[in-house]
């Protein structure tokens, strides 16, 4: 969940702002100067809410309104929605990405409304941004009298412009994400392996013989790894197939037995040895397996991976058998090939290995380049795609207090005037449609919260 220290800092910050605002407003000597300073800068303060409004961008909006106006008449697309809960399905380490991408999506959304309004000869009083507790947002102040005088079709263009601009931003971020390898080609190479950018401390991949930041993973057993997607698919494949075996000369296999005749295959606390099982040629019909305890690193280094004894028949001068680690059903022994060090040997559940490291497809061509730059660009683009697309979808829903409410009202006025001549009946139809849309959206949000928090 969200760290308590973060909540304390946020609450303390808002309390300090509110206390300072209250003291300055109650001061006889500083009240007039303070309120004049706030008004001159377009600032408004209230509990857990800061709002800033300005007219300095009106010229920019006017200029944008004259660029390719036909694009404002197109309609947007769709995106899938998922409830985001910080600390549950949103890592607290990525909150900065979330809020910056959310603010950018909100600014572009309001920019669309402002540009479309100027195209329809509606005056823009100003543009502003706000912070409500921790939620950043933006708004545009339109001249209501002008807005009410234009036709419903013109109003609909203005109300749909925010959704359209969010869709355009979503597509642009998605295109940048796909073209990122081309943009970074002079500085970063791809397709040579998955580069380790972070190792979770205390995880199975941590330690002197584990993975380190800067290592390049090139294979998991006999599954080659060229990208992060290969890493995930190889782990999935290894976890859903039989344990990989290794070709070992028959002469080096010595079955383990106790003095009393019972089998003893490695002690439970052994850190260097592992129990392997195999089938001798004379026991193939009965499928009787024998077990041998062997030093695992020495045994698997330089050996060929196999599935059956037939895989070991070719290419070996001495008779060899395919031996497999004797483990529980879901536990796997995985040999991780990475540069520039030796193999990392992993014993456990494959998902634990996947979550133990952070990887990227981009390998720096020069030593002075930062490993996290491509990761930052990738992560930020993904958040922009998700949040901008989500804003487009949510504001398209006919729901109270969202753009969908005004879009629906304008659409009904533009299409039902000749069919339903009574304005009150049209408003009643719109009310029930808004009620249904709001109920569906609220139900989806509630269901999403339940699914996220119930995991």
Spans of model-derived segments:
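Hydrophobic transmembrane alpha-helices and their immediate loop junctions
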Residues: 1-455
């Amino acid at each position: 969940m969200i760290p308590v220290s973060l909540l304390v800092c946020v609450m303390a910050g808002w309390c300090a702002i509110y206390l300072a605002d209250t003291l300055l407003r109650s001061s006889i000597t500083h009240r007039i100067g303070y309120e004049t300073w706030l008004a001159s800068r377009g600032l408004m303060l209230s509990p857990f809410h800061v709002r800033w409004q300005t007219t300095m961008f009106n010229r920019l909006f006017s200029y944008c309104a004259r660029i390719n106006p036909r694009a404002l008449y197109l309609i947007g697309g769709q995106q899938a929605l998922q409830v985001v809960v910080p600390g549950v399905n949103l890592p607290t380490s990525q909150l900065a990405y979330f809020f910056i991408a959310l603010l950018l999506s909100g600014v572009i959304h309001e920019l669309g409304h402002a540009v479309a309004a100027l195209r329809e000869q509606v005056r823009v009083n100003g543009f502003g941004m706000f912070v409500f507790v921790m939620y950043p947002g933006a708004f545009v102040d339109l001249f209501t009298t002008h807005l009410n005088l234009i036709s419903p079709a013109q109003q609909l263009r203005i109300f749909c412009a925010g959704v359209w601009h969010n869709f355009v931003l979503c597509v642009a971020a998605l295109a940048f994400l796909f073209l990122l390898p081309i943009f970074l080609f002079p500085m970063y190479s791809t397709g040579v392996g998955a580069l380790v950018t972070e190792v979770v401390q205390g995880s199975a991949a941590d330690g002197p013989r584990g993975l380190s930041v800067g290592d390049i993973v090139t294979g998991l057993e006999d599954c080659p790894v060229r990208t992060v997607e290969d890493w995930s698919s190889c782990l999935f494949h290894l976890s859903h197939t039989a344990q990989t075996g290794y070709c070992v000369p028959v002469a080096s296999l010595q079955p383990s037995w106790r003095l009393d005749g019972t089998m003893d295959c490695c002690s439970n606390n052994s850190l260097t040895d592992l129990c392997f099982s195999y089938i001798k040629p004379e026991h193939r019909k009965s499928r009787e397996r024998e077990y041998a305890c062997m030093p695992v690193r020495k045994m698997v280094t330089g050996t060929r991976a196999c599935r059956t004894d037939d895989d070991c028949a070719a290419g070996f001068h001495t008779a060899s058998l395919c031996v497999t680690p004797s483990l529980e059903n879901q536990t796997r022994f995985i040999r991780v090939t990475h540069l520039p060090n030796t193999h990392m040997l992993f014993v456990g559940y494959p998902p634990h290995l996947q979550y133990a490291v952070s990887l990227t497809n981009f390998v720096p061509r020069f030593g002075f380049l930062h490993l996290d730059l491509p990761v930052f660009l990738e992560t930020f683009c993904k958040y922009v795609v998700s949040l901008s697309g989500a804003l487009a979808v949510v504001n398209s829903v006919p729901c109270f207090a969202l753009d969908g409410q005004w879009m629906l009202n304008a659409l009904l006025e533009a299409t039902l005037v000749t069919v339903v001549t009574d304005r009150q009946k049209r408003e009643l139809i719109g009310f029930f449609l808004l009620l249904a849309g709001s109920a569906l959206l609220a139900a989806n949000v509630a269901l999403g919260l339940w699914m996220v928090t119930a995991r």
